[in-house]
């Protein structure tokens, strides 16, 4: 059973990462047989991974054809980013008074790591960005909020794969600037400014993508 779970997870993660990196295109059809051959495993873990990807809204099952990559619409992206603004800002307000010097050092280190990432590959950069936002979220001590945000960031990976390349250079520059400003404001005990910078950070991606599509 342990091996089966591991194989399912491996297939799921690899397909998802390939999607994020743009190796699969929106609406492309994946087949169980091709994935079985690619991974050299039995049908069971591949089928389980595909079912899980369908549950997460990443694929849709097309009887007798295979599994189609579900494209992310611009409106879905906007809705998700707006949700993150509401969730992350309210959570940051809740964290006021709980933030320690150790927390600031941790955030500073994460911010510096992101600032030194010059790769245009989606996964390494997005992973660092997720780490920063998750660390920020965990300051409130609310485990449920952290779980919900992680799910939102995971879903965000899908639109990042479609729109990341077009907006990468400008979004990356503003992202590093805003992250630094958030940490500086928290270190100074200025929650209001930290909230303002966090809002700008989240919405900067939306603005750059909308500009790139005009």
Please annotate each region the language model reported.
Residues 73-74, 162-165:
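Short alpha-helical transmembrane interface motifs in multi-pass membrane proteins
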Residues 98-162, 175-181, 185-188, 193-204:
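Conserved amphipathic alpha-helical segments that form helical-bundle/coiled-coil interaction surfaces
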Residues 9, 78, 85, 123-126, ...:
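Non-membrane alpha-helical structural segments and their capping/turn regions in soluble enzymes
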Residues 47-48, 98-101, 125-128, 166-170, ...:
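Juxtamembrane/interface motifs at transmembrane-helix termini
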Residues 1-97, 138, 211-214:
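Short linear motifs at protein or domain termini
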Residues 54-55, 79-80, 121-124, 168-172:
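A short, ordered amphipathic alpha-helix with a cationic face
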Residues 6, 105, 170-174:
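Short helix-capping and inter-helix turn/linker motifs at the boundaries of alpha-helical repeat units
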Residues 203-213:
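Short arginine-rich
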């Amino acid at each position: 059973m342990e091996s089966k779970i591991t194989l399912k997870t491996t297939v799921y993660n690899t397909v998802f990462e390939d999607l994020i990196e743009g190796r699969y295109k929106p609406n492309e059809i994946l087949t169980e047989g091709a994935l079985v051959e690619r991974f050299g495993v039995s049908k069971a873990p591949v089928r389980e991974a595909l079912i899980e990807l369908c549950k997460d809204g990443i694929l849709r099952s097309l009887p007798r054809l295979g599994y189609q990559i579900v494209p992310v619409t611009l409106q879905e992206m906007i809705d998700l980013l707006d949700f993150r603004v509401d969730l992350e800002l309210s959570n940051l307000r809740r964290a006021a008074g709980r933030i320690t010097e150790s927390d600031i050092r941790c955030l500073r280190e994460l911010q510096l790591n992101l600032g030194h990432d010059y790769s245009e590959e989606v996964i390494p950069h997005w992973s660092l960005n997720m780490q920063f936002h998750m660390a920020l979220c965990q300051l409130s001590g609310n485990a449920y909020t952290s779980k919900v945000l992680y799910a939102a960031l995971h879903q965000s990976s899908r639109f990042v794969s479609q729109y990341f390349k077009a907006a990468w250079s400008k979004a990356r520059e503003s992202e590093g600037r805003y992250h630094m400003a958030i940490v500086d404001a928290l270190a100074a005990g200025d929650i209001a400014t930290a909230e303002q910078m966090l809002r700008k950070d989240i919405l900067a991606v939306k603005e750059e993508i909308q500009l790139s599509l005009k």
